[in-house]
Regions:
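Active-site acid/base region of carbohydrate-active enzymes
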Residues: 1-59
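Catalytic cores of carbohydrate-active enzymes
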Residues: 3-24, 62, 69, 75-155
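An acidic intrinsically disordered interaction segment
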Residues: 23-43, 106-109, 153-167
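Short, well-ordered coil↔helix boundary/capping segments
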Residues: 64, 138, 154, 184-191
Length: 193
């Protein structure tokens, strides 16, 4: 059921086709979705995620860190199933989806910092719009090596890390008591441990 749900949310070309709806009567825009569905997306191989790990709504519904985590978990599922020689069709489907996600991350989820260096975007929509930031939750851009998506010395990751830990990231804060990453959920000028 999980792989079918991932595949369904990956194959959307129109968000109104998704069975998932959410609307909260609230005053904070980060707490609910635009017209119960969120912002438009274009099918591109990534899996839709209406919410961030912080439980704030996504600006663009393809969350790159979550997609990276999903592909590594799909690869792990396939490895386990194949090693046990069970559910080989499910394993092959998981590997196919993981491959599609990986290609889409590198095609749609890579952008440039202010110096022109390639970095991973935080969120994208498939139309070419990107959100350049990071949030201190996991999965996050900083956690990509921890998730097993990239090596910690990968040049693209190192560029992304430099971006995330700089004032180019709107949620990187520096003060007299410390510096670090926060997020929209906690607000401006707050870091999360």
């Amino acid at each position: 059921a999980v792989i079918e749900t991932i595949n369904r949310e990956q194959q959307l070309s129109d968000i109104s086709a998704s069975p998932y709806r959410f609307q909260r009567k609230d005053y904070e825009p980060v707490d609910t979705m635009l017209h119960q569905m969120g912002t438009p997306i274009k099918k591109c191989g990534l899996v839709r995620s209406a919410f961030r790990p912080s439980d704030d709504t996504s600006t663009y519904q393809f969350h790159i860190p979550a997609n990276a985590m999903m592909l590594t978990e799909l690869q792990s599922i396939a490895e386990i199933l194949l090693s046990l020689n069970i559910e080989t069709d499910t394993a092959q489907k998981a590997l196919k989806i993981a491959g599609e996600i990986e290609r889409a991350i590198y095609k749609y989820g890579v952008t440039r910092d202010l110096n022109g260096n390639p970095i991973f975007a935080y969120e994208v929509d498939g139309f070419g719009n990107v959100l350049k930031m990071d949030d201190s939750n996991i999965p996050s851009l900083l956690s990509l090596p921890y998730l097993g998506f990239v090596k910690k010395d990968d040049p693209l990751y190192l560029n992304t890390r430099r971006f995330v830990l700089s004032d180019e990231n709107p949620y990187f804060f520096k003060g007299s008591a410390g510096e670090g990453i926060g997020g929209a959920h906690i607000g401006i000028n707050y870091i999360w441990p």
